[in-house]
């Protein structure tokens, strides 16, 4: 069962049980996946489970009747379901909850029905049926009750099957037999009700001597055994799909009549088999049923030969009723088995693989009866031949030719070009899918390998390469499943090697992955230095003001100026401006259900003003068949990692620019230098935090994980392993970079917000102080403005002073509040950082995330923050105020990282 199917089933179950809140569906899904074991059905376990439920049930007869009905239809997974239900009967608490839930649902349904009936007020006269409608209804019921009901039902069933298969294969419609094939009953070979073998009036058999009675009855039986009514033994009309019954002349001698009744089941079985052969020979029932009907027709011919030989003996006067009973014994067993199989296939409405499953299970059930098992093996081998032809084409060439929709693998029309556009990629997962009902029971264990084998070869064929398996060998049905396993294993190994070599060598998968790592995971720093120097001014603009072609040109220039110029795949790198910032995107992916995130999720993207720095990301052009591995899901993960690291790099550059601009502080007086000392310390702490986080992500998460990925790719044996290794690499990077934990993500975003706002504040204050210094220096050094007359000089000085005062009227207030502002930034940053360290410590111990412990040790290398945590903990215990969280600082103004353009 696929992961998406488990998600769907668990959510539907929670909805039916009306479970809200609690641990959520993810907990139960993980529990189910971790405790999933194959159920091995045995006769003893199935019988004991059935008995246990029957004893528990209030109506055991109804339960056993329903079980037998489903069993006769060859229902899949019936025994595992019964076993699960028997286990539920042992859990009293679960039973009590289910009973209460069923009672509440019944009450709600009754209330809904009551409200609907009361809300609709229909006059009493309107509920009466008019005479005309009553007459039409009587005519319809009369037509249903006619003898052609069975024929009409068969015709309706054929039409349904034909429409279903034509819908699946819209380009190739099923052929149709002409109408006269079904309208002429004499062509069927079964009894013609109401038509005798002769127009002569039969003599009353009771008036004949015993020898004459026996001779007449033998002649009648020879007719009846080939589907023709006799004079004294006649077939009764069929009632639905029940077995054929016969009417024997009551005047017949008692001993003879008893022997006749023993022989008549052969004629009844012959009638059942003949009708089955004619019905299943229609195109709508598929090639497997065609082959089964053909094999049965061969056995029926042998039966007719036997009857002809008996007729020859009868004409020679050598066939008595006792001899007929003796000679018919082998045929009785054969026809009984054929009729039983025909009835089971009809009841189960079996097609394709389900027919083969029924035949295979029946062959095993006759293990103690060699002749019956040999007969079933003959039928199964004949019926499986067309199925195995489709299977051989699939596992040896990657081609599906299944005009009757009987094969276990179903093809869906999907375009491979969509694989690099659609986030929910369906090509690899849903282009070819398993149809559980069409898997023969003897191939159940190999179903996944059969699916993968054909998919691998099909991918190579889609690329224009013709593939033919060199170890191809005809597959023939046998009870020894090892024969199938060996052939499928050989085909699977060949297909895996062909596709893997094709992707690795011809399509250079590893080289493409290294190229993506170079850009998305910042493998080479010189390219990003060039690009951010060139594009930073453009990226500070709002998204709607950015010109994408200009960014593309700057990217191209940065690529050509750096060592990335040697990358053969550099032209596949593109610019992508996302509609949401990283935090919003991640919270949507993680499905966080807080009010704020819900509001953000339903907000129009244009309502959230984004800068280019928040929206910027790379994209990568991936062509088929590499898009099977580097699909849209994988690229989205790469983009999340890139945006996370790109923003960290931007914050680092901002802090470094503050460090550069802080050189002007040396020119100020001692009080100003004291004010700046606290800002310098805070800036260094922020820079230390950002740089250590970047070092952790790049050198302690991504590099080791990348080396593991490269090692695994070298040892991969098939494309599914490659997919698993690549997805595991991305998931590990996302997890260890704190992008899958909502709590850590929120705290980290607040820290980034504080850092960005601090840099904006410092740059603004530094510019203001620098302007003040320049104005003062000009006045002191020059005294007068050169090149101007005295009057003009005074006017210019006054105008400049007025403008300066207008722009910096609050300079004194800004200077006086600078120390308080820095203290507030320090308090916020420390509170959020302590919160992050505390959470990291908890996750590293409780969730065994040992990698996060290294972040804690790096950020708190000298115990500075540990001491603060202990001090805050002591203060909290002294104040005894549990309602005030210690590790939380003042709330940030917005949950997402905001950048103020300079």
From Swiss-Prot:
Q: Which family does it belong to?
A: Belongs to the TUBGCP family.
Q: What is this protein called?
A: Gamma-tubulin complex component 2
- Residues annotated as region Disordered? 875-902
State the oligomer form and interacting partners.
Component of the gamma-tubulin ring complex (gTuRC) consisting of TUBGCP2, TUBGCP3, TUBGCP4, TUBGCP5 and TUBGCP6 and gamma-tubulin TUBG1 or TUBG2. TUBGCP2, TUBGCP3, TUBGCP4, TUBGCP5 and TUBGCP6 assemble in a 5:5:2:1:1 stoichiometry; each is associated with a gamma-tubulin, thereby arranging 14 gamma-tubulins in a helical manner. Gamma-tubulin at the first position is blocked by TUBGCP3 at the last position, allowing 13 protafilaments to grow into a microtubule.
Q: Which GO terms describe its biological process?
A: brain development; cytoplasmic microtubule organization; meiotic cell cycle; microtubule nucleation; mitotic cell cycle; neuron migration; spindle assembly
Where Phosphotyrosine occurs, the residues are 83
* Record's function text: Component of the gamma-tubulin ring complex (gTuRC) which mediates microtubule nucleation. The gTuRC regulates the minus-end nucleation of alpha-beta tubulin heterodimers that grow into microtubule protafilaments, a critical step in centrosome duplication and spindle formation. Plays a role in neuronal migration.
InterPro entries linked:
GCP (IPR007259), GCP_C (IPR040457), GCP_C_sf (IPR042241), GCP_N (IPR041470)
- Gene of this entry: TUBGCP2
Q: What is its main location?
A: cytoplasm
Concerning PANTHER family, the annotation shows: GAMMA TUBULIN COMPLEX PROTEIN, GAMMA-TUBULIN COMPLEX COMPONENT 2
UniProt GO cellular component terms: centrosome; cytoplasm; gamma-tubulin complex; microtubule; microtubule organizing center; spindle pole
UniProt entry keywords in alphabetical sequence: Cytoplasm, Cytoskeleton, Microtubule, Phosphoprotein
An example of a GO molecular function for this protein is: microtubule minus-end binding
Compartments, as annotated in UniProt = Cytoplasm, Cytoskeleton, Microtubule organizing center, Centrosome
């Amino acid at each position: 069962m696929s992961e998406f199917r488990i998600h769907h089933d668990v959510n539907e179950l929670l909805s039916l049980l009306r479970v809200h809140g609690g641990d959520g569906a993810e907990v139960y899904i993980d529990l189910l996946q971790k405790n999933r074991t194959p159920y091995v059905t045995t006769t003893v376990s199935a019988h004991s489970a059935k008995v246990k439920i029957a004893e528990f049930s209030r109506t055991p007869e109804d339960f056993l009747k329903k079980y037998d009905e489903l069993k006769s239809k060859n229902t899949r997974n019936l025994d595992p379901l019964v076993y699960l239900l028997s286990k539920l009967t042992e859990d009293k608490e679960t039973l009590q909850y289910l009973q209460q839930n069923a009672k509440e649902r019944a009450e709600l349904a009754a209330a809904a029905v009551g409200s609907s009936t009361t809300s609709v007020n229909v006059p009493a006269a309107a509920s009466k049926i008019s005479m005309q409608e009553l007459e039409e209804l009587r005519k319809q019921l009369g037509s249903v009750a006619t003898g052609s009901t069975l024929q009409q039902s068969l015709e309706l069933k054929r039409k349904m099957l034909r429409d279903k298969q034509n819908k699946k294969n819209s380009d190739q419609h099923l052929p149709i037999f002409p109408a006269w094939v079904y309208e002429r009953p004499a062509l069927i070979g079964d009894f013609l009700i109401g038509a005798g073998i002769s127009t002569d009036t039969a003599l009353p058999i009771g008036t004949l001597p015993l020898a004459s009675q026996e001779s007449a009855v033998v002649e009648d039986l020879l007719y009846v055994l080939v589907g023709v009514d006799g004079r004294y033994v006649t077939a009764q009309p069929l009632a639905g799909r029940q077995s054929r019954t016969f009417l024997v002349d009551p005047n017949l001698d008692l001993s003879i009549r008893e022997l006749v009744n023993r022989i008549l089941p052969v004629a009844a079985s012959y009638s059942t088999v003949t009708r089955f052969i004619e019905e299943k020979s229609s195109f709508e029932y598929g090639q497997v049923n065609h082959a089964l009907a053909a094999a049965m027709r061969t056995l029926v011919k042998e039966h007719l030969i036997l009857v002809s030989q008996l007729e020859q003996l009868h004409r020679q006067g050598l066939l008595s009723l006792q001899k007929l009973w003796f000679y018919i014994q082998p045929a009785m067993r054969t026809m009984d088995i054929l009729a039983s199989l025909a009835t089971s296939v009809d009841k189960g409405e079996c097609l394709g693989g389900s027919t083969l499953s029924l035949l295979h299970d029946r062959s095993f059930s006759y293990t103690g009866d060699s002749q019956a098992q040999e007969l079933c093996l003959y039928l199964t081998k004949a019926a499986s031949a067309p199925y195995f032809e489709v299977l051989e084409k699939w596992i040896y060439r990657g081609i599906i030719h299944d005009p009757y929709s009987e094969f276990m693998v179903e093809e869906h029309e999907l375009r491979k070009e969509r694989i690099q556009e659609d986030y929910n990629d369906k090509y690899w997962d849903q282009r070819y899918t398993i149809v559980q009902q069409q898997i023969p029971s003897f191939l159940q264990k190999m179903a996944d390998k059969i699916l993968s084998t054909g998919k691998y070869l099909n991918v190579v064929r889609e690329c224009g390469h013709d593939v033919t398996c060199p170890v191809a060998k005809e597959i023939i049905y046998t009870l020894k499943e090892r024969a199938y396993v060996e052939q499928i294993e050989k085909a699977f190994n060949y297909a895996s090697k062909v596709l893997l070599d094709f992707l690795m060598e011809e399509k250079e998968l590893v080289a493409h992955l290294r190229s993506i790592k170079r850009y998305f995971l910042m493998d080479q720093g010189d390219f990003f230095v060039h690009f951010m120097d060139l594009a930073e001014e453009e990226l500070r603009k709002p998204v709607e003001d950015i010109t994408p072609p200009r960014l593309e040109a700057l990217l191209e220039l940065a690529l050509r100026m750096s060592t990335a110029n040697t990358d053969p795949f550099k032209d596949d790198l593109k610019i992508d401006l996302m509609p949401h910032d990283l935090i919003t995107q991640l919270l949507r992916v993680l499905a966080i259900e807080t009010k704020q995130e819900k509001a953000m999720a339903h907000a129009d993207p244009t309502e959230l003003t984004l800068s280019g720095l928040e929206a910027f990301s790379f994209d990568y052009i991936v062509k088929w068949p590499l898009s099977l591995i580097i699909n849209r899901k994988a690229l989205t993960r790469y983009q999340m990692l890139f945006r996370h690291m790109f923003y960290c790099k931007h914050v680092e550059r901002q802090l470094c620019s503050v460090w550069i601009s802080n050189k002007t502080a040396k020119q100020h007086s001692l009080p100003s230098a004291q004010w700046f000392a606290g800002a310098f310390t805070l800036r260094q702490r922020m820079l230390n935090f950002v740089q250590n986080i970047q070092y952790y992500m790049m050198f302690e998460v991504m590099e080791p994980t990348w080396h593991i990925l490269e090692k695994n790719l070298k040892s991969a044996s098939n494309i599914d392993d490659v997919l698993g290794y690549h997805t595991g690499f991305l998931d590990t990077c996302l997890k260890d970079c704190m992008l899958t934990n909502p709590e850590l993500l929120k705290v980290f975003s607040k820290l980034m917000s504080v850092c960005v706002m601090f840099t904006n504040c410092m740059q603004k204050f530094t510019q203001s102080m620098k302007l003040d210094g320049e104005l003062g220096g000009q006045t002191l050094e020059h005294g007068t403005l050169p090149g101007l007359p005295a009057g003009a000089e005074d006017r210019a000085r006054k105008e400049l002073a007025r403008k300066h005062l207008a722009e910096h009227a609050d300079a004194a207030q800004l200077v006086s509040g600078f120390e308080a502002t820095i203290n507030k930034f320090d308090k916020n940053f420390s509170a959020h950082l302590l919160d992050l360290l505390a959470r990291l410590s908890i996750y590293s111990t409780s969730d065994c995330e040992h990698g996060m412990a290294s972040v804690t040790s790096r950020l708190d290398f000298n115990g500075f923050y540990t001491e603060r945590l202990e001090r805050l903990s002591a203060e909290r215990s002294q104040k005894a105020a549990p309602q005030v969280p210690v590790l939380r600082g003042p709330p940030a103004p917005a949950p997402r990282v905001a950048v103020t353009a300079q």
